[in-house]
Amino acid sequence: IKEYKLTTELYKKMIMSFCDAYKVINPVIMGCSMGGRVVLHLALEQSNFFKAVISLEGSDKLDAYYDLDWLHRPDVHGGEVQAAFVSSQIAPQSPEKFKHETLWHYMQGGPGIFKGDLYFYWHDGDFDDRSSLINTKDCPVYLLSGEYDCSCTPERTEATAKRIKGSKATIIPGIGHFPMSENPDLFKRYINPILEEISDL
């Protein structure tokens, strides 16, 4: 069986195929983590299609910081290892029930899927050499990052925002890498004003 690796082109194609199938008009797209990265690609390449993009815990470049081979081995439970790796990215004060639910999602992935997704997230999706070409007048860009995110750190988000002229970056206190799932009530306080701003565009 061929090893699964999510590429930038495949990821963008899946999203645009969905939009085409449902014939969406003037959509706003929001993604988190690897989704936060791919929406920045779409802001660059599909600026006339999307009304705005919202990148949660997203940046235009990341560096790998743990060994991916642990995620797909016959002697290791991949789901439990995946949850262990990402558990450090959740803010300590996030509600326990939401922490567990977030980690439970990571325990459900099929063999090799998370490892293959990280190929895009850590390697193929980097485009810090081109992100400055995003035209935020055509497609406004909003970046939000949690202060407890040790993967896409606030510093990485802010560095990306500096490269994307006209983008708006917000660092959310008391939240980690999974704002919408680890602490939805806190997240709503920050995302709702942005949605209202976009609705007025």
Predicted feature residues:
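Gly/Ala-rich beta-loop-alpha elbow adjacent to hydrolase catalytic centers
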Residues: 31, 35, 39
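Short beta-strand/loop motif that positions the catalytic acidic residue
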Residues: 137, 143-145
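Acidic catalytic loop of the alpha/beta-hydrolase fold
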Residues: 147-152
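Short alpha-helix in the alpha/beta-hydrolase fold that links the catalytic acid
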Residues: 153-162
